Curated annotation (Swiss-Prot):
Annotated protein name in UniProt: Thrombin-like enzyme saxthrombin
Domain of life where this protein originates: Eukaryota
Chief location category: secreted
Assigned GO CC terms: extracellular region; secretory granule
Positions of disulphide bridges: C31-C163, C50-C66, C98-C256, C142-C210, C174-C189, C200-C225
Amino acid sequence: MVLIRVLANLLILQLSYAQKSSELVIGGDECNINEHRSLVAFFNSTGFFCSGTLINEEWVLTAAHCDNTNFQMKLGVHSKKVLNEDEQTRNPKEKFICPNKKNDEVLDKDIMLIKLDSRVSNSEHIVPLSLPSSPPSVGSVCHIMGWGSITPIKVTYPDVPYCAYINLLDDAVCQAGYPELLTEYRTLCAGILEGGKDTCGGDSGGPLICNGQFQGIVSFGAHPCGQGLKPGVYTKVFDYNHWIQSIIAGNTTVTCPQ
């Protein structure tokens, strides 16, 4: 079963696709406090439920399946229980999902751009991560991070984000693991073939950083997490560069690539 990685009232909703917004990094270690300065934590009335990535002082990029009616975004967070001096909280001013997204296909165009209600000030623990200048190559070393579950079956949510390194795999690996993953979906396949390292429930919307560039958004994967032949699937950011840049420039009617 594909796991959509989202936290909703601490329940994993097992649907035909279960996305990762409730998942944590499996097989990782606690992130260094300065290792995730672009990582954004999403909170609603029930608590943490998704992540995003700050791409400039006014915009955050996340997964479309992380959309929620009422939520706040916290930047500069490490421990969810201990306030950082430079931590900042923002609300969404505008949210943009691909107008040509197929609503009945949760895996299609799983990307959302959020304009903040006010600009973020860069600080010791808050620094934006630029959009990629080129697409990633198979074999690239990629960095994953998040507050998602750190155990693959029984959900265990950490107080601090966990980080791990995985590899960008050939798309054929994910096509074999997920026959329902259509070839036209603009996604990346990343993990460890022997298993044991993966994003998991609660990590949805967070970044996949390959060779220092922001290349992917946590979208979905298998349950249990960390299965070698069923790696994580990530929205391919590079393919959406034009859509993202057009919206930021004020062209809010632009469509996403098919």
